[in-house]
């Protein structure tokens, strides 16, 4: 590996570029100089990886290392940027796929599995070059991280780009297994960005932040080089630290910029940055310091891809694209807030869905309020258990949440079971499918929904960390009481490598500020009901400009005639399919009408988190949606390159593995039927604002 520091750009492939000047796109280049896009702030860091000691896909760990324990730091208090990158790739790769051999890793997907689904690639290390930089508006506060990976197998005569916008609020490697891996194996450049969230953490007590490579610095000294610094005056910070010690600010929650409104824009910038990198690497040599422009907008086959929030960003980018940067779209389980027309409708089995097209601010705050109670329903017996708390504590939380909801008039029933049944019925009425019932507990117990409710409420109200919105904050705590306490060692040195940008993460917890502050699950017998109700009321009462900020993130479902594939699991309990993919397809049939080239594949027994599939009860009931994301990318590639028709929209009826929870039999192709060319009765239809999905 060769690493070049800040302020230096290496012109890799100059000799090759000179030799191939007459090949590929724009052969008769006029000598136009390749210029760094104006949104790039500061220098570009360029690093070459040999594919042996280090590489683009696995950071030198290979297929075996990714499946093993986390790579260690030589000095845990001062990890190097290379060590942090390795840990970030290890943790982000594992966060989005099932890493168990029985679940399919190493057989259906993984660095060793080629694009045809065969395990032919050994450890799967991929040599190539990375380009890393910030995008900013001149304020030094946006600092969206952009990263381009150019594999050594990139063919400048057949250029392609795949976007891999981070999922969730993850750092820049946050979609490496979801989209980056496929792109690298295809020989495409991969354009990553962190959407302006990027796992940016600010340790308020020590005034410590992370830089673009994850290394630490003092916030004041770092200045505009900081990934994120909370917008708090020194006086306010000192006062806050005095009252609320051991607290942390996070970029997605506390940047006061509502970054979601710019996710599409950031993805387009990532593509433009990739064009610059490819021109820099393969463009004609103009002189000893400059390359020319070989590729102009639209010259490179570009697939906007990713999952979850990254999928939503890809759709937004395709909608906003006015310069032909994007050729096609392939996304999984996209988190999108759709601007719905009054005449749009979602039907399943011929029956109208009770609710569809709600924004995340609505359904997440409702779920955060009701899920702990709904989870107590006897009808959900045998649901997977994803809490780190003792089962007795969890059951007590559920009972107490039901009782408090009933006392507040928010659920009906004289006992826990009737209250839980009503809570579950309310979730159904709000658009959650019965297919996701057994995941309601997991979404709250894993703290996914509480984390999302708090982070997005902060973002949508543009709150400062010092506001302690709804009395929640992020802090280190002590076990087993969950009380806020100073950590034995700061979580900051490793946060770039292990954090996901939405506490609880990386040793930083979500706390409710009772007394000194306590883990929100343990702060009160009903698990901080008052805070959950406050979050809900921000939406229902239209407080603190939340409706306007939510409106700013909505998409219009007009892909401008671009071919597109959406894949989502029917059992998704984090981003309900009625509010996301189904709503998007319905609205697309209005926004684009006959121009639409969008197809939608709904996967039965598929849910949001493939990384949960090794857990007992997940393994027996649910299948990997990632498998179908990869198939969709292959289908789109054949469509773009060979003119093959995309299979029509359909329900894919998978077969759960079954067996004993925690010991399900190995996944086989029998569990994963192919996407059908002629789906027959499984066809999904859309037109004039209506989507019809068969039961």
From Swiss-Prot:
Keywords per UniProt: Hydrolase, Secreted, Signal
An MF annotation (GO) of this entry: hydroxybutyrate-dimer hydrolase activity
EC nos: 3.1.1.22
Chief place of localization: secreted
Domain of life: Bacteria
Signal peptide residue numbers: 1-17
GO annotation, cellular component aspect: extracellular space
Reactions this protein catalyses: (3R)-hydroxybutanoate dimer + H2O = 2 (R)-3-hydroxybutanoate + H(+)
GO biological process, one term: butyrate metabolic process
Class of this enzyme: hydrolase
Active site, UniProt feature: 308
RNA-binding keyword on record: no
Places the protein is found: Secreted
Pathway(s): Lipid metabolism; butanoate metabolism
Function as written in the Swiss-Prot or TrEMBL entry: Participates in the degradation of poly-3-hydroxybutyrate (PHB). It works downstream of poly(3-hydroxybutyrate) depolymerase, hydrolyzing D(-)-3-hydroxybutyrate oligomers of various length (3HB-oligomers) into 3HB-monomers.
Family to which the UniProt record says this protein belongs: Belongs to the D-(-)-3-hydroxybutyrate oligomer hydrolase family.
Protein name listed in UniProt: D-(-)-3-hydroxybutyrate oligomer hydrolase
Organism: Burkholderia ambifaria (strain ATCC BAA-244 / DSM 16087 / CCUG 44356 / LMG 19182 / AMMD)
Taxonomic lineage: Bacteria, Pseudomonadati, Pseudomonadota, Betaproteobacteria, Burkholderiales
């Amino acid at each position: 590996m060769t690493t070049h520091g800040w302020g230096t750009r290496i012109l890799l492939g100059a000799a090759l570029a000179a030799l191939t000047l007459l090949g590929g796109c724009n052969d008769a280049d006029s000598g136009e100089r390749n210029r760094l896009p104006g949104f790039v702030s500061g220098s570009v860091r360029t690093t070459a990886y040999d594919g042996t000691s280090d590489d683009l896909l696995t950071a030198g760990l290979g297929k075996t290392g990714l499946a093993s324990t986390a790579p260690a730091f030589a000095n845990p208090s001062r990890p190097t940027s290379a060590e942090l990158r390795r840990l970030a790739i290890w943790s982000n790769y594992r966060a989005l796929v099932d890493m168990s051999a029985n679940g399919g890793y190493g057989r259906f997907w993984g660095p060793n599995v080629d694009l045809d689904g065969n395990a032919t690639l050994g450890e799967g290390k991929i040599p190539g070059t990375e380009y890393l930089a910030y995008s900013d508006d001149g304020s030094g506060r946006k600092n969206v991280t952009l990263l381009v990976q150019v594999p050594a197998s990139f063919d400048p005569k057949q250029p392609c780009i795949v976007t891999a916008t981070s999922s969730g609020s993850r750092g820049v490697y946050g979609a490496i297994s979801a989209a980056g891996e496929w792109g690298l194996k295809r020989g495409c450049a991969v354009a990553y960005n962190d959407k302006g969230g990027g796992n940016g953490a600010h340790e308020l007590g020590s005034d410590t932040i992370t830089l673009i490579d994850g290394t630490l610095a003092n916030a004041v000294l770092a200045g505009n080089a900081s990934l994120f610094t909370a917008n708090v005056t020194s006086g306010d910070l000192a006062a806050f630290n005095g009252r609320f010690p051991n607290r942390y600010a996070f970029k997605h929650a506390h940047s006061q910029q509502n970054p979601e409104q710019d996710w599409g824009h950031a993805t387009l910038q990532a593509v433009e940055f990739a064009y610059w990198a490819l021109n820099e690497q393969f463009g004609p040599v103009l002189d000893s310091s400059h390359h020319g422009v070989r590729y102009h907008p639209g010259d490179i086959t570009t697939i906007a891809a990713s999952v979850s929030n990254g999928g939503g960003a890809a759709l937004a980018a395709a909608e906003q694209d006015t310069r032909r940067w994007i050729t096609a779209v392939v996304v999984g389980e996209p988190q999108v807030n759709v601007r719905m027309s009054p005449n749009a409708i979602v039907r399943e089995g011929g029956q109208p869905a009770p609710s569809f097209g709600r924004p995340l601010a609505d359904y997440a705050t409702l779920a955060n309020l009701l899920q702990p109670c709904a989870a107590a329903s006897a009808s959900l017996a045998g649901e997977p258990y994803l809490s780190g708390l003792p089962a007795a504590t969890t059951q007590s939380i559920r009972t107490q949440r039901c009782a408090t909801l009933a006392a507040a008039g928010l659920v009906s029933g004289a006992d826990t079971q009737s209250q839980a049944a009503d809570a579950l019925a309310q979730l159904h009425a709000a658009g959650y499918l019965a297919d996701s019932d057994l995941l309601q507990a997991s979404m709250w117990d894993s703290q996914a929904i509480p984390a999302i409710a708090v982070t997005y409420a902060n973002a949508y109200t543009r709150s400062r960390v010092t506001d302690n919105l709804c009395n929640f904050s992020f802090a280190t705590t002590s076990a087993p009481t969950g009380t806020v306490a100073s950590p034995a060692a700061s979580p900051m040195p490793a946060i770039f490598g292990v954090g996901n940008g939405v506490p609880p993460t990386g040793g930083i917890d979500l706390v409710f500020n009772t007394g000194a502050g306590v883990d929100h699950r343990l702060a009160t017998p009903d698990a901080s009901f008052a805070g959950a109700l406050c979050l809900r009321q921000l939406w229902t009462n239209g407080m603190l400009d939340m409706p306007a900020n939510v409106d700013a993130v909505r998409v219009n479902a007009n892909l401008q005639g671009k071919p597109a594939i959406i894949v989502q699991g029917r059992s998704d309990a984090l981003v309900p399919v009625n509010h996301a993919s189904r709503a998007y397809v319905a609205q697309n049939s209005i926004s684009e009408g006959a121009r639409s080239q969008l197809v939608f594949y709904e996967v039965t027994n598929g849910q949001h988190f493939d990384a949960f599939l090794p857990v007992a009860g997940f393994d027996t009931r649910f299948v990997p949606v990632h498998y179908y994301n990869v198939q969709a990318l292959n289908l789109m590639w054949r469509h773009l390159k060979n003119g093959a028709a995309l299979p029509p929209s359909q329900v894919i009826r998978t077969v759960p593995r079954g067996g004993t929870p925690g010991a399900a039999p190995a996944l086989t192709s029998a569990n994963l039927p192919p996407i059908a060319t002629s789906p027959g009765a499984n066809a999904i239809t859309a037109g004039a604002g209506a989507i019809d999905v068969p039961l």
